[in-house]
Amino acid sequence: MSLRLPQNPNAGLFKQGYNSYSNADGQIIKSIAAIRELHQMCLTSMGPCGRNKIIVNHLGKIIITNDAATMLRELDIVHPAVKVLVMATEQQKIDMGDGTNLVMILAGELLNVSEKLISMGLSAVEIIQGYNMARKFTLKELDEMVVGEITDKNDKNELLKMIKPVISSKKYGSEDILSELVSEAVSHVLPVAQQAGEIPYFNVDSIRVVKIMGGSLSNSTVIKGMVFNREPEGHVKSLSEDKKHKVAVFTCPLDIANTETKGTVLLHNAQEMLDFSKGEEKQIDAMMKEIADMGVECIVAGAGVGELALHYLNRYGILVLKVPSKFELRRLCRVCGATPLPRLGAPTPEELGLVETVKTMEIGGDRVTVFKQEQGEISRTSTIILRGATQNNLDDIERAIDDGVAAVKGLMKPSGGKLLPGAGATEIELISRITKYGERTPGLLQLAIKQFAVAFEVVPRTLAETAGLDVNEVLPNLYAAHNVTEPGAVKTDHLYKGVDIDGESDEGVKDIREENIYDMLATKKFAINVATEAATTVLSIDQIIMAKKAGGPRAPQGPRPGNWDQED
């Protein structure tokens, strides 16, 4: 009797080469195990004392960061269940800017504790129902835990309350300098609210960052306008600062238009050759004179600048700057109010822009061109000039600034100004409240709700671990501070008890009001929503079916024997 080999299920349904993983093979447990690997990797990067990771992507670029969204974006992840969490962190990054590590760690912890529930016999449906009930309860409780609100969004000191904790979680120790830079740059571009309660419009693209090697972070500064990491093309390098200067922006080349087809010109003598070149010179001279007669003192070109055109522009005393990036060209038009012109010729008065200062500066060893507006006016773009010793450090600082700017964007939302206690104080309080809610819930769903509360313990525990504190000592002290009310204390004083990452107190607990450590309500709500949805999505998957990858046969990787051009 011949041996009968088992076949893949649905072998006649899909093409050859597909893979299928179902619950019969322990698919959920395997997905949780795969996510746990990523969860452990991001765990040590959370908080102000979080460790950095060195990532070498598929292009060989070295990235040093502790931001979960950046790490996951650069890694080539193929597991479909893990990709669900990657998309969740990306969504948090796009919408709120901050809280990406919280999304990844909380979602991973929710799946870790769900594994215990599955081993106890609970079905995935019951766990999902319990998690959704706990999520709705948590969002309601967060509204009751608000301890402050930023009312004046144009006040620089109020902005610092919200920007500083965001940046300190990425670049601890440099948060004072960076938060001052971000708040100053935001104050330059943020319009003043005309009415009480009006929310000003803020565009994150209005804050630009220019990185210049050399010096230290304390040498960084903010320019009310734009900075280009190149100098002008001609002899004119700067314009006087006693008046406003007219600016013309061209997206076409500053040169004679050439035909697409080649032509031949027959010249009989030297005079014909001189007359031929004179025609070009007169045409270019006439164009540049028309531009100069309009009072233009600065030209920004998005394409090439011909030598002949540059010669006449130097003669008329016009500064010429080449900006190859169409995005930078668009931002410069916003700064000076100019209209980009696709044709070479004299612009109309409505198409010209105005700028107060155009000058070339030497910062470090680089020459940069600065377009600066008046101090009393609201600029549409502000630029932060960063100084540092290494390119990797500058890139990481830029990502921290981007998070701070994105947090300002979240602040401009209707409920963005409300603040929650930071340093793990909110999570400790949520554990107590969600656990009590689970005890009031009948049936098996209370097990899932209680485990949902247990998952929040990962935040204060990780903050204490990365700070080098004894977790077994800090967590009990933190629970006691939230459950025991001191004599004469205000009823809500326990909400402000968080993890002391500096180790100034023996108990590892401090009042977060001393350091103004707050979290944004909108960011926390969005992170809990996204993390819970990602975890329940993974739990709801009962089978993974992966088709065969597209593509033909791969070329041999090793060297061919013999000479390189030898025939087969």
From Swiss-Prot:
The modification Phosphoserine is found at S505. SUPFAM superfamilies: GroEL apical domain-like, GroEL equatorial domain-like, GroEL-intermediate domain like. GO terms for molecular function: ATP binding; ATP hydrolysis activity; ATP-dependent protein folding chaperone; unfolded protein binding. Molecular chaperone; assists the folding of proteins upon ATP hydrolysis. Known to play a role, in vitro, in the folding of actin and tubulin. In yeast may play a role in mitotic spindle formation. GO terms for biological process: chaperone mediated protein folding independent of cofactor; protein folding. There is a cross-link at K15 (Glycyl lysine isopeptide (Lys-Gly) (interchain with G-Cter in ubiquitin)). It is found in: Cytoplasm. This is T-complex protein 1 subunit theta. Belongs to the TCP-1 chaperonin family. PROSITE patterns: TCP1_1, TCP1_2, TCP1_3. Gene3D superfamilies: GroEL (3.50.7.10), GroEL-like equatorial domain (1.10.560.10), TCP-1-like chaperonin intermediate domain (3.30.260.10). Keywords: ATP-binding, Chaperone, Cytoplasm, Isopeptide bond, Nucleotide-binding, Phosphoprotein, Ubl conjugation. Heterooligomeric complex of about 850 to 900 kDa that forms two stacked rings, 12 to 16 nm in diameter. CDD domains: TCP1_theta. It comes from Saccharomyces cerevisiae (strain ATCC 204508 / S288c). Coiled coil: none annotated. InterPro entries: Chap_CCT_theta (IPR012721), Chaperone_TCP-1 (IPR017998), Chaperonin_TCP-1_CS (IPR002194), Cpn60/GroEL/TCP-1 (IPR002423), GroEL-like_apical_dom_sf (IPR027409), GROEL-like_equatorial_sf (IPR027413), TCP-1-like_intermed_sf (IPR027410). GO terms for cellular component: chaperonin-containing T-complex; cytoplasm. Pfam families: Cpn60_TCP1 (PF00118).
